[in-house]
Every structure is written in C-alpha cells, then in structure tokens.
Curated annotation (Swiss-Prot):
Assembly information from the UniProt record: Single-chain monomer with multiple functions.
Classification via CDD domains: DNA_pol_A_pol_I_C (cd08637), H3TH_53EXO (cd09898), PIN_53EXO (cd09859)
Keywords on record: DNA damage, DNA repair, DNA replication, DNA-binding, DNA-directed DNA polymerase, Exonuclease, Hydrolase, Nuclease, Nucleotidyltransferase, Transferase
InterPro entries for this protein: 5-3_exonucl_a-hlix_arch_N, 5-3_exonuclease, 5-3_exonuclease_C_sf, DNA-dir_DNA_pol_A_CS, DNA-dir_DNA_pol_A_palm_dom, DNA/RNA_pol_sf, DNA_polI_H3TH, DNA_polymerase_1
Gene it is expressed from: polA
Domain 5'-3' exonuclease: 1-283
Name the UniProt record assigns to this protein: DNA polymerase I
Species per Swiss-Prot/TrEMBL record: Rickettsia conorii (strain ATCC VR-613 / Malish 7)
Length: 875
C-alpha cells in the first residue's frame, strides 16, 4: 500500500479521548489544561511519520443530536459527561489538526463514523486504498480488501481473523451480530441475555436479523425464541443504530484531502502558546522545518564560542559591550564551585574559566592574580549605561561579596520567568546541561545557552508587560533579590556552647526514654525503624490499631497512630512521641547548627529561595531557619540559641493576624473589617459567636479553638480536618464552620468565587496582580487540594508581597540614614533585625511605620515589635 493511492481517515475524538486518559495532566504557560491536546498532537505526528500519507483527513463528530436520536431518543443517554478538564480542551482539538495542516471533515447531524464510512466507501470505489485509524469496533463493518482498519492502541492492522476471534463472525456480518448483542456504551438495547457466542450462532444459521424474525419458529431454543419475540422492536432498532450511513451528503473531492507541510510560523506559534517544547525536535526532523523558539535555547546554533585568556581580550569585549549597551553574563557553578564566567554579545559567546573553585562564600579573592578578569567585569556590572542580562543573579552578587550593592542595570531571566508563571513547572535553562559529567562539556553547552540571553530578555520583558506583571518583577522581585543576598551574607549569630549543652540534655533524656521504652516492650530494638517498631507494638505487645501499610508491607507507626494509642492509655505511645520530638530537635538543630557556623564570620548563613513556591513566599535552606519550632518549650529553648552580637540587640517585627486582615480586605467582609477597625480581639469575637458565650464567660481554651477556626478557614480546612485539630466530633466541627460562615458573611462566597475562577483560568491573583497558578485544579484526584490552595494563595501571596515591599522600603531607609541595623531573617510574617543597642530606640518606630504602611488596605495593618538578647526573649 503506497502513499500515492492511500487515504488516511483519522477518528478525531477517538484519538483525543485516548490521548486524555494516556497522558499525565499537563498545563500550558497560562495554566490551562492541555494534556489531551499534547497527546493528540503527538499522535498525529506519529501517524505522519509512520504512514507518510498523500491524502489524509481528521474526522470529528459535530456534537449534539443526530439522526440516530430520531430513531431512538435514548441513544447514548447513559454516557456521563467528559471530565471537566477535557471539556475545556475539546474546542481546541481542531486547532491541533489545522496547525499540522490536516484537512478536517465534519457535518452537522452526523457522527464521525458515518463521515468515515462515506469517504471510505467512495474512495475504495475509485480503486484507491483507505486506512481508517481508530479503535472503534463499529468501524470494523467497513473492512474490505481496499478498506483497512489500523488500531493505534494495538499498533497493528485488524484482520478478519481478529474480528472472527472476538465476535464469532466476519466483518460483513458484524452489524447483524452487534444488533443482537447491543452496545452498553452507546445505550443500544440489543436482545437481553444474548451474548457474542449466541448472536454469532444465530447469524451463522439465519444470515441476518431480519431472517431470524422471519423464521422464528426455526429457533430451536424455546427460551431464545420467546426472548427474541419479546425483543423484536429493540433488535430492529439496534440494527438501524449500529449501521453506518455511507451516503452522507458531502462534497467528495479526494484532491481536497491532499496533505502538504504546515506553515512553519503558524505551527511554531501554536506549539509555543501551549508549551509543547518537547515536540520541537520531532516536528523539525519530521517536517523539515525550523522552529525558532526563544525558550528552546540550549540547541541554538552559536556562530562562535571564544575563550578569553587575558585582560586585553576582555577589554576588547568591554569596549564592544559599552558601544552596544547590552550583553549577557552568567556565572556558571557546578556542585558549589565557580567554573566560569560566560559572556555573550551579539552572535558570540565568551568563556572565562575560573581557576579558584572554592565554594566558600567569603573566601573568594577577587583581587587574586588569577582573577585578572574580576575588575573589568565589575566595571561593566556597575556601569549604569550598560544593561546586563543574567540568569540567577545571586551567585553573581555573592562573587563580588561586599561590592555587590554597586551592581546596577541588571536583569534576571529566572526572576522574570517566575513573575510570569509562579506555580507552573519552572524550566531551569541549565538543568539538562548540568547533568553532564565532563566539565568542558558543561561549559561549552552553557555558552550555547548564554548566547540567547538578550533575545530571551526582549521576548520575556514583552510578555511581562503584556501580562501586566512587569511592575511585580521590577518593583518587588528584582530588588528583593539584592536584599536577600545581603541577609545571607550577614547571617545570624548562634551560641554553639549553649547548643552543645542543650544537645547533651536532650541526649540524656533520650537515653532515659529508650530505657523506659525497652522496659515496657520487654526487648531492645531500633526505635527509629518503623518496621521494627510496628512489629514490637502490634505483634509482640498485641496493641490495638495495628494497620499494615500496603506499600511498605509493614505497620503504620505515624504520629496519628501513636496519638490514638496514647488516648487509650498506652504509656509507651507517649514515650515514643516524646522520643521522636527530642531526637528530631537534636538531629536537626542542636547537633547540626554548630557544624554550620562559618569559620570566618562565626555566624550561620542560610540561603533564601525566591522561586520555589507558587505564591511568591520565600523559603530557606541549609539550614532552614524558617521552621525553627516555637510552640513547644524545647523549640523555644532552641530559639534561645539565636543571639545578638555583642553590643547589639535582636528586634522581632511581626505582623499581627495579617492573613485575616487580608481576607477581610479582599473578600470585603464587613464583620471582620469592623472588628479590626475597632481593634477588637478577633479570636475572642469568633469564640463568642461560635460558642454562644459572652466575653467574660470565655476561657483560654475557647479562644484557642477560635484561633484554630479563624486560621483554618483561610486554608480551606474541612470539617474532618478541623475536628482532628480541635479533638471534637465531625458534627461539632461542621457546626463551627457553619456558624463561622454565618457570622462572617461573604467568606464562603469568596471561597466559591475563587474556586470557580481558578477552575476557569488555571490561576488566581493576589492584591498586587501576581498570578498564582494552580495546575492541579483539573486533576480529579487532587482537585480538593488544589481548591484549598487556590483559596489561600491570594491571601498568602498578598501577605508575602506586603512583607517584601516592607523589606525593600526598610533597606532603603536604613541606607539613607546610614544606620548599622541589619535585617537578618524573614520568617513569613516576621522580620528579625540585629541593631546596635544605641539604635534600638531609633529603628523601632521606623520599622513599625514602614511595615504598617507598605500598602493600603480597608483595615489597619498592625506590627508587634519586641527587642531582646535572643530570639526566645522576643517571642
């Protein structure tokens, strides 16, 4: 079968549905679900590759009712609607075919099967060959010498033997057999209790459904005869429904279905719009076209990669960069070591290898003889008239240590991309390159990427402005990067001797706990092994609630199980919970923090991650100083280890109930707004309403529960989750939530509107216009999780940007006043400063004023400020 005389007919929606269920959920750069579109595109490309057709068409159902519904109104009535995230994609599937230049066939009132039948039979009548691409059994009726069925699921042509094996009859009799069997998926009734074996036997004997009913007295089985007699109408209707109409009134011109390569620009735009970059290579190789995509830059062709080996060569580059006014720069790092500076200008890339590969933040000597390039590059970085384009700015800032604040006119592509699409899969430009094992390859391949920095910048800056997120990037994300770099370099002092003492105390109690645990269990074992612990608790000791984990083939010994055992009076559970708490504190903090004290600064230096969350919220690592415990006495003891340098005080500035204030503002909740304007205690007010008590009747427990309800609602907590948190029944928790929504009218409406917006758009926005994408909103299994995230994201995201604005304004004010106060940590709602003792009274009102006036809201923003010698004192 050659392509010259073959027509390829593709069952469009059959392919789309198959693609949807075969493909993991994917989202476009705009947050829209595109998994089915991606799979459909990939499948069509495979068909082009495998069949290389001259004539081809994608055939679609027109939707709505057709002539079969006139015959049988309940036709397909039992079919559930497609999944919500597939429905969104269906109007776009024709774009896929169109952009690949596939002709499209459809006609109102007819199904794709009928259109396929019409074109297949007419084409075959001309002596040409037809290949139908479908897994639909109904189309097997069309099989002839010239009409073949190719099943893409099985990757093979269907033969007559396959049909006989499955249905007990040949393709020309399939309609007769199927009329008796019926088709549950299409709600075609058939004849009750007649399956494939009986149906094929009857058709073999009588030849057709009509002949059966004309010769009912010859049916040997009395029961079958009665069943058929009672189902005559159903069988004849089924025969009509299953048959294919091969005479649909269509303009049959085979030449109109001739395939030609698609328009390169049009196809490129389509692939870019939906983020199908992984298909670029296939498209280029298959269609012999070039896709010019600014984001797929690792494979770009570089005119020249040149290594600069001396100051004269670099000076020539600097002259050219000054003349042009823009260049790309990237500090390439690998496994903590600085490998090279890579510069780009016009169509060239320049490499400066770094001989000193120390990854110590403070030991890199920019004045070393080996660093002949340092001053020249620094002069370029500090020249306001030259724009610099980089990716991941902080390593560059660290390289120049205390001089980094002079770097100006620089743009960070990583931060620009984050401002565009926080929450979507961030494509690190250098991720694949850094998987290389040969250093020389890493440098060369990175140089190929850097050559495209300027083009990528121009495209991304346009996208930022088009999406109205440029100000977020330029006013918040970029300046905060400089401040985070400064904070990381400053670090915070930790009392190593105190931690050593605390670690010893924890260790003593841990040993004592282990002895008690072993005594109660009657044996020694590895307490840290969930498998061994499960066997001891639920096999040796025969305690209740033992539940085997299917994945691990061992008992579950999580906190929930131990707490349940504790509630039922099993002392060993209390000991185990305490043991886990102390060992975690010891391993995570008291033992490890002293090891992370820098040898030169004698301080701990965390790393702040700016692009790791969907809401813009900062995170911290190596060590994580945002999760230092606060609610337990032991956690507070660890906070005591964070101390002010001699002659300084620590100052904590903490936003009070900021997320509830933001909720009152964005959801316009009058009761909440009035409470904050009146400076009422919001948790007390909630407690009064929930528990139907007067203020003087409330206990601290009432307020604690009200606080949990207030903040739980923000995070979309369920009745089950609240019940567990408050240790009440599900019914009580449901009643609390119901009363909360009644008291604070508008909260529930805000939540429903936010979920609906997220479902329609794939993202939500905070008060500053930052888009927080929720790509899992259409995932059936994770929908509820995504909805909770969508509810909270505008609140948390607004909170995050408020505190970032405060940090930027405070940094400017401190610089302006030439104060020695320094910002050392950001812990979500809290800023931690280190101030000289004689500046505490000066800086405190400045901090309060700036933090409380970072933005305008319908309610006042309140900041609580405390100063002390250590972090525990000020909480």
């Amino acid at each position: 079968m050659t392509q010259k005389n073959t027509l390829l007919l593709i069952d469009g929606y059959g392919f789309v549905f198959r693609a949807y269920y075969a493909q993991q959920p994917l989202t476009s750069p705009k947050g829209e679900p595109v998994g089915a579109l991606y799979g459909f595109t990939s499948m069509l490309l495979k068909l082009l590759s495998d069949f290389k057709p001259k004539h081809v068409a994608v055939v679609f159902d027109s939707g709505g009712k057709n002539f079969r519904h006139q015959i049988y109104p309940d036709y397909k009535a039992n079919r559930p609607p497609p999944p919500e995230d597939l429905i969104i994609q269906l109007p776009l599937v024709r774009d896929v075919a169109s952009n690949l230049n596939f002709p499209i066939l459809e006609k109102n009132g007819y199904e794709a099967d009928d259109i396929i039948a019409t074109f297949a039979t007419k084409t075959a009548a001309l002596g040409a060959h037809v290949v139908i691409i479908s897994s639909d059994k109904d189309l097997l009726q069309l099989m002839t010498e010239n009409i073949k069925i190719y099943d893409p699921l099985k990757g093979k042509y269907i033969t007559e033997d396959d049909v006989v094996k499955k249905f007990g009859t040949t393709s020309d009799k399939l309609r007769e057999v199927m009329a008796l069997i019926g088709d549950r998926s299409d709600n075609i009734p058939g004849v009750p209790s007649i399956g494939p074996k009986t149906a094929s036997s009857l058709i073999t004997q009588f030849g057709s459904v009509e002949n059966i009913f004309n010769s009912l007295d010859q049916v040997s089985s009395v029961k079958q005869r009665e069943t058929l007699q009672n189902s005559r109408e159903a069988a004849l209707i089924s025969w009509q429904l299953i048959g294919l109409n091969s005479n649909v009134d269509l303009d049959f011109q085979l030449n109109n279905l001739e395939w030609s390569p698609p328009n390169s620009d049009k196809l490129t735009g389509f692939l870019q719009e939906y983020g199908f970059r992984s298909l670029y290579k296939r498209v280029e190789n298959l269609l012999d076209i070039k896709i010019n995509d600014h984001k797929e830059i690792a494979d770009s062709k570089v005119t020249e990669i040149k290594e600069l080996n001396n100051a004269n060569e670099l000076a020539d580059f600097a002259k050219e960069a000054t003349k042009i006014g823009i260049f790309g720069i990237y500090l390439l790092q690998h496994k903590g070591a600085n490998l090279a500076f890579i510069l780009s200008l016009q169509n060239q890339s320049y490499i400066i290898k770094i001989s000193n590969t120390s990854h110590d933040l403070f030991s890199y000597n920019t004045k070393s003889n080996n660093n002949w390039f340092s001053d020249i590059i620094f002069n370029l970085l500090t020249d306001k008239s030259i724009k610099k384009i980089t990716y991941s700015l902080k390593p560059l800032l660290k390289f120049y240590a205390n001089q980094s604040h002079d770097i100006t006119a620089i743009e960070d592509l990583e931060l620009m991309q984050y401002a565009l699409s926080a929450g979507l899969s961030q494509k690190n430009l250098f991720k694949e390159v850094l998987k290389e094992t040969w250093i020389e390859n890493i440098i060369i391949e990175s140089a190929k990427i850097v050559i495209n920095f300027i083009a990528l910048y121009k495209q991304t800056i346009w996208e930022l402005k088009d999406n109205k997120t440029f100000r977020l990037y330029s006013n918040i994300d970029l300046p905060i990067c400089f401040i985070l770099d400064k904070m990381e370099k400053v670090g915070i002092t930790v009392d190593a001797n105190y931690l050593k003492q605390l670690s010893a105390e924890f260790g003593t109690e841990i040993l004592k706990l282990e002895e008690e645990i072993f005594a109660l269990s009657g044996t020694k074992f590895n307490i840290g092994s969930p498998k061994q612990l499960g066997e001891i608790l639920f096999e040796k000791m025969q305690l209740p609630f033992g539940k085997a984990s299917a994945k691990a083939s061992s008992y579950s010994t999580g906190a929930e199980i131990l707490e349940k055992l504790s509630e039922h009076g099993y002392n060993i559970a209390d000991l185990l919970l305490r043991w886990r708490q102390l060992t975690k504190l010891k391993n995570t903090y008291t033992d490890s923090l002293p090891k992370q004290i820098d040898n030169i600064t004698h301080r701990v230096h965390t790393t702040f991650l700016q692009t790791s969350t969907t809401t813009g919220r900062l995170s911290s690592q190596e060590p994580n100083l945002q999760n230092v415990p606060i609610r337990s006495s032991e956690g507070n003891q660890i906070r005591k280890a964070f101390i002010a340098e001699e002659g300084y005080k620590l100052i904590s500035a903490d936003y009070s109930q900021i997320e509830l204030r933001i909720l009152s503002h964005i959801a316009n909740i009058d009761a909440l707004k009035q409470a904050f304007i009146n400076k009422d205690d919001i948790h007390t007010q909630t407690a009064c309403q929930i528990f139907n008590l007067q203020k003087h009747e409330l206990t601290s427990e009432h307020r604690r529960k009200a606080k949990a309800i207030n903040f739980g609602i923000i995070y979309g907590i369920s009745a089950f989750g609240l019940a567990k948190q408050l240790n009440v029944t599900n019914g009580e928790a449901s009643e609390y939530i119901k009363k909360y929504f009644a008291e604070y009218k508008g909260v529930q409406e805000y939540m429903e509107q936010t979920k609906a917006f997220a479902s329609s758009n794939g993202y939500v926005t905070n008060c500053f216009g930052r888009k927080c994408f929720v790509p899992l909103i259409h995932d059936k299994k994770l929908k509820q999780f995504a909805e909770r995230a969508a509810i909270n994201a505008p609140i948390q995201g607004t909170n995050t940007d408020i505190i970032k604005i405060a940090m930027i304004n405070l940094d400017q004010e401190i610089e302006k006043r030439k104060l020695k106060t320094r910002l050392v940590l950001q812990i979500h709602d809290e800023l931690l400063f280190e101030a000289p003792i004689d500046e505490v009274e000066i800086i405190t009102p400045i901090i309060k004023k700036i933090m409380e006036n970072s933005t305008n809201m319908a309610v006042p923003i309140i900041t609580e400020i405390r100063a002390g010698n250590n972090w525990m004192e000020i909480h």
